[in-house]
């Protein structure tokens, strides 16, 4: 997460080749836990897009999607009517889903629908949602889909496991970090636009510190930019103060998060924070080095921390998802 996949999708949507020839819809289903909620988020995203159009698509929307129970309100000052969807608007999710797909296919231009955090579908209460969506999408002639997600291993499993409905139904692409040789001139140009400069070594240190993860680098570079005056050059001497400033602002949130964890979960988290990138976390060496209780207690703690998105994992490597939280732990414990 926070590598920039959502920004990349919106960047794609803003390209003339896409913007001029397609209708685009972006829907984030991270907060969904059922088919009803999926249909709600999808319908709401399409409705919001339809509201922006001035070509009578709103009438067409309600003509095709008849099963929605939409709320209407009248502004007492302007007299204008507005409408919105609520979760209660979805009475028959499968019927509404059928109508939504019919609506997308009936548009005057092809549609591109981007579904973010698509891996959540695999955790729905209903067991058949992946198969249902696959069958609907397979029938589309004019609508194309982008599936994005922050849990790489879950996304990979959804599209590359022969047992899964979406097996080989899309081309997979991992979003890697922007290369340093591309990122460095970009940062330098932004400083120069405002009459400032930045040492290449500063950019490289920030890049290495956050493994090229876009969101964290941008926050850190913004802090450094703010602390650099007009006509000045940002140097390595400013790095620690910038990082400390960010961590200090987030101190309350970090303490709150830590207070919600059990003692054993805190122990494991602090051990991984000290390592930065931790390997072999259930090995006798790791357990002994950090004075943890046992391999099984580490395993159960990690299971919870992964589920809460506090830890992230790639193969046998574990690290704290929020780099600033990890730095805060190292400094305070």
What are these regions (language model features)?
Residues 171-182:
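Conserved AAA+ ATPase "SRH/arginine-finger" region at the nucleotide-binding site
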Residues 6, 213, 322:
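Short, conserved phosphate/pyrophosphate- and ester-handling motifs at nucleotide-, phospho-/glycolipid
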Residues 152-170:
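Short regulatory helix/loop adjacent to the ATP-binding pocket of P-loop NTPases
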Residues 3, 7-112, 296:
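P-loop NTPase nucleotide-binding core
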């Amino acid at each position: 997460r926070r590598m920039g996949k959502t920004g990349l999708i919106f960047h794609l949507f803003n390209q003339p080749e896409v913007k001029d020839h397609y209708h685009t819809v972006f829907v984030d289903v991270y907060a969904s836990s059922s088919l009803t909620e999926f249909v709600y988020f999808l319908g709401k995203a399409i409705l919001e897009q339809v509201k922006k159009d001035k070509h009578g698509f709103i009438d067409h929307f309600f003509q095709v999607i008849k099963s929605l129970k939409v709320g209407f309100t009248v502004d007492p000052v302007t007299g204008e009517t507005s409408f919105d969807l609520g979760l209660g608007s979805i009475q028959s999710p499968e019927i509404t889903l059928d109508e939504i797909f019919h609506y997308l296919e009936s548009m005057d231009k092809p549609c591109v629908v981007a579904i973010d955090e698509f891996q959540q579908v695999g955790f729905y209460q209903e067991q058949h949602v992946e198969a249902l969506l696959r069958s609907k999408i397979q029938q589309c002639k004019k609508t194309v889909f982008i599936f994005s997600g922050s849990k790489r291993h879950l996304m990979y499993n959804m599209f590359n496991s022969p047992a899964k409905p979406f097996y080989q139904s899309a081309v997979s692409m991992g979003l890697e970090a922007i290369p340093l040789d591309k990122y460095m001139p970009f940062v330098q140009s932004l400083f120069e636009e405002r009459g400032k400069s930045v040492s290449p070594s500063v950019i490289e240190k920030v890049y290495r510190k956050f493994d090229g993860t876009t969101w964290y680098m941008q926050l850190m570079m913004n802090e450094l930019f703010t602390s650099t005056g007009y006509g000045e050059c940002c140097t390595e001497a400013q790095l620690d103060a910038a990082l400390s400033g960010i961590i200090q602002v987030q101190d309350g949130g970090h303490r709150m998060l830590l207070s919600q964890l059990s003692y054993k979960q805190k122990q494991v988290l602090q051990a991984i924070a000290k390592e930065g990138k931790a390997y072999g976390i259930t090995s006798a060496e790791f357990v002994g080095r950090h004075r943890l209780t046992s391999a099984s207690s580490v395993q159960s703690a990690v299971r919870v921390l992964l589920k809460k998105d506090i830890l992230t994992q790639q193969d046998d490597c574990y690290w704290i998802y929020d780099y600033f939280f990890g730095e805060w732990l190292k400094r305070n414990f």
